Amino acid sequence: MMIRDTRPKTSLLRGLTITLLGLALLSPAAYSADKVSLTLYNGQHKEVGDELAKAFEAKTGIHVNVRKGSSNQLASQVVEEGDRSPADVIYTEESPPLNKLGEQGLLAKIDASTLDVLPKDYVGSNGDWMGVTARTRVVAFNPKLIAEKDLPKSVLDFAGPEWQGKVGFVPTSGAFQEQAVAIIKLHGREAAEEWLTGLRAFGKVYSNNMVALKAVENGEVATVLVNNYYWFALKKEKTNLDSQLHYFTDGDAGGLITVSSAAALKSSKHPKEAQQLLAFMASEEGQRVITNTSAEYPLRKGMESNRGLKPFSELQPPKVTPADLGNAEEALELERDVGLN
């Protein structure tokens, strides 16, 4: 005998609606709607930011939208956006842009547990930004054009007339500007102005570091002032290089150490997850992701580069920390004064 369902049709429809709603709430799409997604303003090299975001999402399930731009451009954008900024974390190729944001009170304090794994000299004095990886300023030279023994003892000596047409530099480079600030800190503003004036008079200006390095490699110029990792990046493209690296010693400004840096914004809508991303960047896994992509030094205590770099402990940089470099405005002013900017 067939049993007829005597419930009103409206009850049946209500039950069906509730069931379907329950299934919808259990679906992956419903979960993804509630999932946190971070926005990273990336002033570092594109490949580094992309690989970092991919590894962090694989580790935590948190998606990272990466917006690429120059470090200074992104820092200016954060200032302009204020509390409306969509950025949660900003990652820069150098520290001055973050010093600038910190001075304006736009950065959040970084968790102490994250800062504790990094050397004190490479974090912001207020604990609101951190160095992520390090690189050193070097001279790339072509031994077919000049012997290493004939290179100057100090980077300041490149400003002399004997270097006419023999030294290249990139005045728009953030690291070059940091080097100018280091000279101000070590030797005074007048010495830095003389150095920039001499380079302008006798050196060759290049548009970016890789163009400058390739000029040495191709024998167009004997030496260029660059960061060490550009040479290793070129080595990936061309196994046998014609150029070599020279490291300044005895605390000379030519051996300045600069750092890529990161910070969380006070305006972040996801402060907990932003701190997670910073912690990942300082973790052993995060540091390895970055240094496997770009030949930089890991800053996490106890870690060493596996890219064949000169050991970090053997570098002899000047006693100028990233925090000492401030926002690099002094260098930009000097460059304008001598006609380089």
What are these regions (language model features)?
Residues 33-99, 341:
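Early extracytoplasmic/lumenal segment of secretory-pathway proteins
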Residues 296-341:
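An extracytoplasmic/periplasmic, membrane-proximal ligand-sensing/linker region
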